[in-house]
Amino acid sequence: MDTQNTPVHIKLWHRDFWRLCFANLLLMSSVYMLIAAIPYFLILEKYQLWQIGCVLLSYGLGLFLFGGFCSYLVQRYRRNMVCQLSILGVVVCLSVLYYLDTFWNIKFSFEVLLAVRFLLGAFLGLAQMSLASTLVIDSCESFQRTEANYITSWFARFSVAVGPLVACFVYIYFGMEYVFPTASVLALGAFVLVSRAKFPFKAPAEGIKVFSL
């Protein structure tokens, strides 16, 4: 078994690093696809502009929910499992409202929409922290970490363009109602890529506080 100090990859651009970079791209693109989709559907449901703004804002606030607990979670539990479960949380948040509304005709209140968007932001924030700050770092050697962080951040920036472009393509050729399922598929793709990546063994640190800034 590899230890924490065992050199695993000499080159940065190895298979697992590619998987993590594209997982980051798919995950962030799935969320950026909703930039146009959420206002579109909320306007159809006759929501007021301030309500639409609050729904969008709740996502941003949710990003910070697990920030103080991330260090404890990745040390207490397997770091790749923390990331994978967080991504599954994103998938559930992307899917639940769409499928219940489309197939079961269940309408949700404004408060429930706020809660789901808040949870979406919370799960995405934890997935991003565990992916970009932990898994990517652990997949490369110490002298490559600055370059790895730089590359990963550019994949995330690229998703700002990819997400809305994919949403526009889906809207033009299939309809806006397919944007949410497509976003869920992209997030599932990120889950598969992370689950396929391999990481060296890392002993958990001792004395980690449950909450830390």
Residue ranges and their predicted role:
Residues V116-A156:
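Cytoplasmic helix-loop-helix junction between adjacent transmembrane helices
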Residues D2-H14, F199-L213:
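Juxtamembrane intracellular "pre-TM" segments in multi-pass secondary transporters
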Residues V185-A203:
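C-terminal membrane-cytosol helix-exit motif in multi-pass small-molecule transporters
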Residues L88-K107:
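C-terminal ends and interior cores of transmembrane alpha-helices
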Residues G60-G68, V160-A161:
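Residue-level signature of mid-helix packing/kink "hotspots" within the transmembrane helices
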Residues F66-R79, Y171:
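Helix-to-loop junctions at the C-terminal end of transmembrane segments
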Residues P7-G60:
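Helix-loop boundary and gating motifs at the non-cytosolic
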